């Protein structure tokens, strides 16, 4: 599983990982440092990071990334830092671990797909991408990005990611 957000952050992927382990699957989660939603690293994680190395029988591999903090620039740096950490450090930490499938959990940002598709290439594993947010449409709809050039660039990035996935799952029929 590749997800920028994971336990102790409260996301649906936590339930899926628990269920997959209960069904007998060996699950490894590649994720970042827990800091959502407040934008600062969880105190419990800072005090004892090793306590967060497993979750319900799944191995949790965390890569360094900047906390979200406040403001748009800080958020973009948070997204970019997970791409770098997940794309460079992630494969090193997962060296020697085979993968049958790479499952991507994407509530936002779509950039979580970059380290996943790179890891899929390295591991020669299919990539399944669960899109819970539409990019670049969401950026335009909520007014975060108004530049047509930036939206077009994000659209190219989305196509790059989706075209390298074996399967893209939409949250609802409206996504299709």
List where the protein language model places each region.
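Alpha-helix capping/helix-boundary segments
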Residues: 35, 174-176
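N-terminal subdomain of nucleotide-sugar transferases
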Residues: 1-56
